[in-house]
């Protein structure tokens, strides 16, 4: 599929996605096209978008990839394929989770086989699969990415996300939390209300100003850098303009204490799931209160109260001091990042790296540029 075709296939893409089990936000046309529009030229990417069609011309599968030619400091030329939405070790773009090949239900095996076959005929030295669900490596192997092709698969990172089932009763979920988590998430509301008026409300641009400016200000104060740089801001603004194409809506919210905004939360709802993308708050507001927990508690409660929302997804990533998401009585989702290496030279270099002591391996990697 060409770049021009990618730009105009929103409806066809979404029909295929809705008939699949792929993630409805991260694998949506609004998310991936906004990512491509934002970073493709900045990073010098070439689109490698594979479409699989049935005999009637219906789109039944999508292999979303892009390619970049790298020349390492050691003058090694590497043709690297990426799954669309991530630029592993290249640039800190937004994080795209649940990356996978999209296949209409009933066509999974055919799509997997066709995509792997197409990849075999393309020119590339290694393929980077970032933040893919746990079953995707097995899917690639089943499609032919195994030892028979003499590819080497290198596991790089494993990460965990948390999904909270919000189809049930909020009070039952709350009571199942640990005592300290329940205190920080819910019970501290009473303490805050003794200090003054506490308000959780949806963001309104005409009333509340620029949401992302507020978010970035909180992050600069806490982390020393904004949550979203210039490109990331462009991406999120484009995404929000296109959310209706994937039946999504923004769920941005503010937490006010005595009419002062002390916390912001950036969520997006698509289909029956609410995704927690980012948050920012006044860290030194009160030593007895974690505003991040309090605000998240309000948002999770809102997901429970909304009839059509069955899941609140905290996504992958840890907090500043601990993996706080594990305390929220949710289900773990496992993500993998791995390389599929085809180039004999790269396989040899990675073998040297793997066989070396850690300090030597790091020095070798820096010198070669792996």
Report residues per predicted region.
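A conserved beta-strand-loop-helix scaffold within acyl/acetyltransferase catalytic domains
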Residues: 2-84, 88, 131-288
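Active-site/acyl-donor-binding loops of N-acyltransferases
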Residues: 67-71, 138-173, 257, 309-370
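Residues forming anionic-ligand binding surfaces in small-molecule and nucleic-acid pockets
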Residues: 86-102
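A short, internal acetyl-CoA/4′-phosphopantetheine-binding micro-motif in the GNAT/acyltransferase core
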Residues: 98-108, 279-289
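Conserved acetyl-CoA-binding loop-helix of GNAT-fold acetyltransferases
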Residues: 107-118, 287-301
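ATP-hydrolysis module of ASCE/P-loop NTPase motor domains
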Residues: 109-112, 117-136
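Conserved GNAT acetyl-CoA-binding A-motif
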Residues: 124-132, 303-316
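Hydrophobic, well-ordered secondary-structure elements that form the walls
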Residues: 259, 292, 299, 303, ...
């Amino acid at each position: 599929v060409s770049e021009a075709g990618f730009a105009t296939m929103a409806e066809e893409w979404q029909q295929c996605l809705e008939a699949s089990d792929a993630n409805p936000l991260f694998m949506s046309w609004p998310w991936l096209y906004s990512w491509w529009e934002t970073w493709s030229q900045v990073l010098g990417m070439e689109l490698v978008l594979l479409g699989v069609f049935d005999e009637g011309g219906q789109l039944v599968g999508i292999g979303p990839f892009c390619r970049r030619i790298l020349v390492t400091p050691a003058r090694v030329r590497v043709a690297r394929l990426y799954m669309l939405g991530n630029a592993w070790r290249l640039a800190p773009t937004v994080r795209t989770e649940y990356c996978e090949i999209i296949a209409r239900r009933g066509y999974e095996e055919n799509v997997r086989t066709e995509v792997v076959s197409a990849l075999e005929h393309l020119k590339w030295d290694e393929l980077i699969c970032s933040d893919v669900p746990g079953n995707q490596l097995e899917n690639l192997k089943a499609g032919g990415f195994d030892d028979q092709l003499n590819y080497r698969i290198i596991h790089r990172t494993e990460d965990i996300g948390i999904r909270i089932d919000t189809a049930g009763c909020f009070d039952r979920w709350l009571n199942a939390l640990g005592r300290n988590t329940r205190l920080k998430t819910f019970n501290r509301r009473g303490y805050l209300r003794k200090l003054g008026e506490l308000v959780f409300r949806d963001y309104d641009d005409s009333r509340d100003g620029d949401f992302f400016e507020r978010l970035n200000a909180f992050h600069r104060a806490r982390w020393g850098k904004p949550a979203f740089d210039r490109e990331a801001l462009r991406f999120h603004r484009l995404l929000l303009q296109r959310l209706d194409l994937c039946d999504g809506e923004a769920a941005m919210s503010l937490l006010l204490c005595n009419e002062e905004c002390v916390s912001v939360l950036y969520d997006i709802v698509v289909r029956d799931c609410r995704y927690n993308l980012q948050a920012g708050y006044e860290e030194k507001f009160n030593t007895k209160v974690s505003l991040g927990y309090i605000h998240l508690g309000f948002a999770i409660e809102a997901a429970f109260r909304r009839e059509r929302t069955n899941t609140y997804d905290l996504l992958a990533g840890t907090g500043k001091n601990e993996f706080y998401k594990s305390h929220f009585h949710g289900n773990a989702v496992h993500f993998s990042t791995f390389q599929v290496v085809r180039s004999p030279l790269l396989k040899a270099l990675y073998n040297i790296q793997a066989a070396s002591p850690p300090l030597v391996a790091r020095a070798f990697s820096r010198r070669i540029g792996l």
